């Protein structure tokens, strides 16, 4: 290796390459941090933004004037202040003018400045811009020595180290940037709330962050949306870091055919709507989110943001919303990092820090402005006094000037004879003849008076820190009054810790109806009006000529509904997964929801809150066979189904109830037999077993239902001709499994066979439904409590050609 020679007059100093790399990287890092990525806490601007606004101010591109080509603006910034790429300057200029990027844009754009959908702005040779009116407050008083200036990159000009910034840019518009080893991500806020917080701080500098939070509710994003939870907001205000969950704002519209459409009118901050629509479409095509028929971005200047998600008929909008929030940016987290430069060094800042540093900056600006104005006023009053003296002795002064050979001699004589100084003498010799009028003399005397008052006011201001703070407070209030507006982002207290369907679905009692031909729907219980015993009922379904309601059940929207078919297979759905329909609609076919074979019917429905090994599904077949299986055996059933009960040839499953191990059950037959027995008499079995004999039947009798015994309740039976009664459980003694049971009802042709039974409280209501779709909702207390052998009372006045086919208890709450 060739030996390096020592330069003439120089010294070679050996250094460690590791040390040099570290030093160079730190220098580079600090350059990026200070000169590029992080905003100054005082005016809230990064250097490129500050240079853009200052260059536009220097070129007179104020709001009252015309716009100028962005190419010219970018060129001015590059040539005088920012020796970097033109793309970075133009990108920064564009962002300052986007109303979806900044809460209060400081650039007034002309032309295509990009869209929220990610469309790029037009090239800078096509677009124009000028300062927005609010931006003028950022540079106001900059000519009054309110801020310090430094030489530009080539010493050909000077640029401000900070702008006067009467408008609290950092709090109002936030900031984002990535430096070396650090990043900032500060949210925007509402200007009126910021002004209130600044006023509160000025009045009481010792106030707590919580008291500041009483003024500033939270971030206010330009794209609106809804913030969920206040913990993240509070944490970010107290520590400078926090996570804020934002969701899109939406409405749900239903067309005449019952199809729902979800319309999003606001999205979380910084969400690209084009990518969002593409993401929703991909999820819909991949069947990750089911039920979406179409999605369109209908955003326009006339309608504003509008993303339309059309759903297939029968699809619950709440379920789709849940998936959209979970799998797309329609719910996003804004990670707050309040990092800004304080005296040239990056610092993590609390809300109070941000307010304090802004107030301190404005105090410095107001103070420096007052000193400048005081100096200018003193200089002017010095001249005005001289001019007034000169006008009072105008004849002598005119004679003196006329007899002077040149200007310098005239000024010398003025100094000697009238005791004027150089500045005053120069002003007198420069005075125009029009100033000799009486009106001008009076004007000077008025100006002298005004200047005297101004000087007194400024001197008083500079000696009173409280008055300086008062000016800061007033000017901030004036900005808020001029440019402040209502909040765009709402805040709700609910925290979102995890996403679940139930988070979006109101708990509500639903009536689930299944027709003989397999149509299923859910209808809110509130849709049925209460009627007295003997009422005519109201239509519950608009069914085909040969169809009729065969099953009716009530459950909460958050419950699981287990369907057990005539062939002994089990399926389940969440209640909200069953399409909701009006009372007159027939609903959706069961085969569109469950994978039910063509030769099986839903014959039993069980509602349960959760699957467990402590609870059982107790099933009964038409031929009296019973079986008990823990509910956790059915976790995987879902819509594809699994075996629940192995049936003998010709037998069908007719009923099932949810029981605990210690419960007693009662089997009731169509011809009026009731067997009360202990549930322990039936051992726990696996899903593939056939069950055991539960009740001994005659050759013509069949099981009509099975109940869980509760002494607080009574047995309610209903016959096919609309007669019913209540009987106390205490009238039945416990018998062994496989016995015939006791009499509960005597069947007659006029009243018909038993079609169903319920265990009810006096405060319950029951619902009956006929094969022709008529329903009646009746208070249980209106149905008489009778003995085991009584025939019952008329509950439903039905047509001779109609029969009661279903009975259900309507749960309260």
UniProtKB/Swiss-Prot annotation:
GyrA-box (motif): residue ranges: 531-537
Subcellular location: Cytoplasm
Top class in the EC scheme: isomerase
Active site per the UniProt annotation: 126 (o-(5'-phospho-dna)-tyrosine intermediate)
Molecular function, one GO term: ATP binding
Domain of life: Bacteria
Function of the molecule: A type II topoisomerase that negatively supercoils closed circular double-stranded (ds) DNA in an ATP-dependent manner to modulate DNA topology and maintain chromosomes in an underwound state. Negative supercoiling favors strand separation, and DNA replication, transcription, recombination and repair, all of which involve strand separation. Also able to catalyze the interconversion of other topological isomers of dsDNA rings, including catenanes and knotted rings. Type II topoisomerases break and join 2 DNA strands simultaneously in an ATP-dependent manner.
Family per record: Belongs to the type II topoisomerase GyrA/ParC subunit family.
The protein's name: DNA gyrase subunit A
């Amino acid at each position: 290796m060739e030996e390096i020679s020592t330069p003439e007059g120089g010294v070679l100093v050996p250094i460690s390459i590791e040390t040099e790399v570290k030093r160079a990287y730190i220098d580079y890092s600090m350059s990026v941090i200070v000169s590029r990525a992080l905003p100054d806490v005082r005016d809230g601007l990064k250097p490129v933004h500050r240079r853009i606004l200052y260059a536009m101010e220097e070129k007179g591109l104020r709001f009252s004037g015309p716009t100028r080509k962005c190419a010219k603006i970018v060129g001015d910034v590059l040539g005088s202040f920012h020796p970097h790429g033109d793309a970075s300057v133009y990108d920064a200029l564009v962002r300052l003018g986007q109303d979806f990027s900044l809460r209060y844009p400081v650039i007034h754009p002309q032309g295509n400045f990009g869209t929220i959908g990610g469309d790029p702005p037009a090239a800078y040779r096509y677009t124009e811009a000028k300062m927005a009116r609010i931006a003028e407050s950022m540079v106001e008083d900059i000519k009054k020595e309110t801020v310090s200036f430094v030489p530009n990159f080539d010493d050909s000009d000077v640029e401000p180290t900070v702008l006067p910034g009467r408008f609290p840019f950092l709090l109002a518009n936030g900031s984002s940037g990535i430096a070396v080893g650090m990043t900032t991500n500060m949210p925007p806020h509402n200007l009126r709330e910021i002004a209130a917080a600044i006023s509160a701080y000025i009045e009481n500098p010792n106030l707590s962050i919580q008291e500041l939070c009483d003024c500033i509710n939270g971030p206010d994003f330009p794209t609106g949306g809804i913030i969920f939870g206040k913990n993240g907001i509070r944490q970010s205000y107290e520590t400078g870091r926090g996570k804020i969950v934002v969701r899109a704002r939406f409405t749900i519209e239903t067309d005449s055919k019952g199809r729902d459409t979800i319309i999003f009118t606001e999205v979380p901050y910084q969400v690209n709507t084009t990518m969002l629509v593409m993401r929703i479409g991909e999820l819909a095509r991949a069947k990750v989110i089911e039920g979406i028929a179409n999605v369109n971005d209908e955003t326009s200047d006339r309608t504003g943001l509008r993303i339309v998600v059309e759903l297939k008929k029968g699809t619950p909008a709440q379920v789709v919303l849940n998936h959209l929030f979970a799998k797309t940016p329609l719910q996003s987290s804004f990670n707050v990092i309040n990092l800004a430069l304080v005296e040239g060094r990056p610092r993590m800042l609390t809300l109070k820090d941000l307010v304090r540093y802004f107030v301190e900056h404005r105090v410095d600006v107001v103070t420096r402005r007052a000193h400048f104005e005081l100096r200018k006023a003193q200089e002017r009053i010095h001249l005005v006094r001289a001019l007034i003296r000169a006008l009072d002795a105008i004849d002598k002064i005119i004679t003196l000037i006329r007899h002077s050979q040149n200007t310098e001699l005239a000024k010398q004589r003025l100094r000697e004879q009238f005791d004027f100084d150089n500045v005053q003498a120069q002003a007198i010799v420069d005075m125009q003849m029009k100033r000799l009028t009486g009106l001008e003399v009076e004007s000077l005397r008025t100006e002298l008076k005004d200047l005297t008052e101004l000087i007194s006011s400024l001197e008083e201001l500079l000696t009173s820190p409280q008055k300086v703070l008062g000016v800061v407070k007033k000017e901030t209030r004036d900005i808020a009054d001029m440019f402040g507006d209502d909040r765009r982002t709402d805040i709700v207290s609910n925290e979102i810790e995890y996403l679940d369907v139930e988070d979006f679905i109101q708990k509500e009692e639903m009536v689930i109806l299944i027709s003989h031909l397999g149509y299923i729907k859910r209808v809110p219980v509130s849709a049925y009006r209460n009627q007295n015993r003997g009422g005519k009922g109201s239509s519950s379904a608009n069914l085909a000529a040969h169809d009729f309601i065969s099953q009716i059940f009530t459950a909460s929207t958050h419950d699981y509904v287990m369907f057990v078919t005539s062939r002994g297979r089990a399926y389940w759905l969440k209640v909200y997964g069953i399409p909701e329909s009006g009372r007159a609609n027939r609903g959706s076919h069961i085969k569109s929801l469950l994978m039910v074979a063509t030769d099986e019917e839903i014959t039993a429905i069980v509602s349960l809150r959760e699957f467990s090994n402590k609870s059982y599904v107790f099933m009964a077949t038409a031929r009296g066979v019973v079986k008990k299986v823990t509910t956790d055996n059915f976790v995987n059933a879902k819509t594809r189904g699994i075996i629940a009960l192995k049936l003998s040839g010709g037998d069908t499953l007719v009923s099932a109830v949810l029981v605990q191990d210690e419960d007693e059950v009662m089997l009731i037959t169509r011809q009026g037999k009731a067997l009360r027995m202990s549930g322990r008499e039936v051992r726990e079995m696996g899903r593939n077993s056939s069950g055991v004999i539960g009740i001994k039947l005659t050759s013509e009798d069949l099981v009509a239902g099975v109940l869980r015994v509760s002494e607080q309740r009574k047995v309610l039976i209903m016959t096919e001709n609309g007669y019913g009664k209540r009987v106390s459980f205490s009238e039945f003694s416990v018998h062994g499994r496989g016995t015939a049971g006791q009499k509960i009802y005597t069947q007659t042709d006029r009243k018909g066979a038993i079609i169903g039974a319920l265990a009810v409280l006096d405060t319950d209501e029951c619902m009956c439904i006929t094969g022709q779709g008529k329903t009646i909702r009746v208070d249980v207390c209106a149905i008489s409590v009778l003995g085991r052998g009584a025939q019952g009372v008329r509950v439903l006045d039905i047509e001779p050609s109609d029969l009661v086919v279903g009975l259900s208890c309507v749960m309260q709450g």
